[in-house]
Amino acid sequence: MIKVNVLAVKYLASASPALCKQLGAPEGLPCLGLITTDCDDATYIALDEATKAAEVQVCYGRSFYGGASNASTPYAGEVLGILAAATPGAVRSGMDAVISALEHMGFEDVGVPCMAYTVSSCGSFLAAEAGVPMGSPIAYLIAPPIESMYAMDAALKAADVKLCKLYTPPTETNFGGGLLTGTQSACQAACGAFMDAVREIKE
């Protein structure tokens, strides 16, 4: 597994109302937690975990062009994620959950970096992204361009899952993939088929 490196974490105990509005933080949630890492997709999953562990919302999450290997500054990495909360304690609890989740996930290296991760019960962030109810299982699938589209077909055929969102390349990081939903076991089967298909590309 290619481990995720947390590059920077900062807190704003009472951010400017104008900044909060532009970032999409709901009114009444002025406390922000900012994080950058070198793996965007793992960070999005970890941000979602925070919404289940603490009274926080993900108000911002964007990947950077070219990916971590082309980062322009030491703390840029591949993604900026921002949590919003009503109190400094809540936003710190949420960020602790993000960092804890990142310690246990990352990209797989099967000749190319890729990710096939089953979220057993999604929080508010991924639920909104996938358009599914909170608590739904999600298969989060990401790989380089040709691998992602080839393997997505295999994942959809391998299990009784629904394609909720397709990320067609080029994305900011030039990868592709998508979010599937179904039962937890179906999502796990889809993840397995996705990884097997990614491996086939180099054969």
Regions found by a protein language model. Give the residues of each.
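Flexible, small-/acidic-enriched active-site or ligand-binding loops
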Residues: 57
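Short, conserved "active-site rim" segments that organize catalytic pockets and cofactor/ligand binding
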Residues: 44
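A structural signal for small-residue-enriched, beta-sheet-centric alpha/beta enzyme cores
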Residues: 2-39, 62-79, 85-87, 106-203
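Short amphipathic alpha-helices in soluble, non-transmembrane regions
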Residues: 92-101, 190-197
